[in-house]
A protein has these predicted regions:
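Ribonuclease/tRNase effector modules and their secretory precursors
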Residues: 1-94
Length: 94
């Protein structure tokens, strides 16, 4: 699996949410992460994943995914710390 993103969007996300996409990708290493479809935008299906990063912060990451050359590819759209309700949802799944 590989990750990509728009660097301008990464900088904007860091300024707005205090979170870089480099950190956001860590949620995909969480064996307890919860992924669900979000919505379709311009014919592109978007997903959200709630997961733990660095074992200390539960994050919500929005992204699209596809397969390229037989490998899963993920484009990060946005990332932020999970809300209280989202954290509860994650913790209930443990």
């Amino acid at each position: 699996m590989y990750f990509e993103w728009d660097e301008r969007k990464n900088r904007a996300n860091l300024a707005k949410h205090g979170l870089s996409f480099e950190t956001a990708v860590l949620v995909f290493d969480d064996p307890h992460a919860i992924s669900q479809p979000d919505r379709e935008v311009g014919g592109e299906e978007r997903w959200q994943t709630l997961g733990m990063a660095h074992g200390i912060a539960i994050l919500l990451v929005a992204y699209t995914e596809w397969e390229e050359h037989g490998e899963a590819a993920i484009r990060i759209i946005s990332a932020r710390k999970a809300t209280k309700r989202e954290r509860q949802k994650y913790e209930e799944g443990l």
